[in-house]
């Protein structure tokens, strides 16, 4: 089994990383492979609801200029997903929200049947 942990904090080794690292450590202690992917300072374009991802049916966003399609590819090869993000002004960090919206719309098929969790700090 493999779990993808996505660190949506702009601080590479901040509190979100600490929480995800401890989660990964516990998973690995139980024989579960864990990968932490940091997206924090990478540009993530917001979804414009153009619908092209649904038309093409390939679990990909037509905008291939950020990390979204890379994350979707990793999601396809994992068995569970954990998204971690800090909370700023009552909401998760902007990069994490934009990524979540794009992943769910463009890569929704990659999520089906997979457990998912969110860690906020």
Task: Describe the function of each predicted region.
Residues 2-32:
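N-terminal beta1-alpha1 ligand-phosphate binding loop
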Residues 18-21, 50-52, 95-99:
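Short, glycine/charged-enriched secondary-structure capping and boundary segments
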Residues 32-42:
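A short beta-strand-loop structural module common to alpha/beta enzyme folds
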């Amino acid at each position: 089994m493999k779990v993808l942990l996505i660190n949506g904090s702009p601080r590479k080794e901040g509190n979100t990383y600490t929480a995800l690292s401890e989660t990964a450590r516990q998973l690995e202690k139980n024989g579960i492979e864990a990968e932490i992917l940091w997206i924090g300072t990478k540009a993530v374009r917001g979804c414009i609801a153009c619908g092209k991802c649904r038309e093409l049916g390939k679990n990909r966003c037509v905008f291939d200029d950020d990390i979204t399609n890379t994350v979707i590819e990793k999601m396809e090869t994992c068995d569970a997903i954990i998204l971690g993000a800090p909370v700023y002004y009552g909401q998760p960090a902007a990069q994490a929200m934009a990524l979540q919206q794009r992943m769910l719309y463009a890569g929704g098929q990659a999520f089906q049947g997979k457990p998912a969790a969110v860690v906020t700090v």
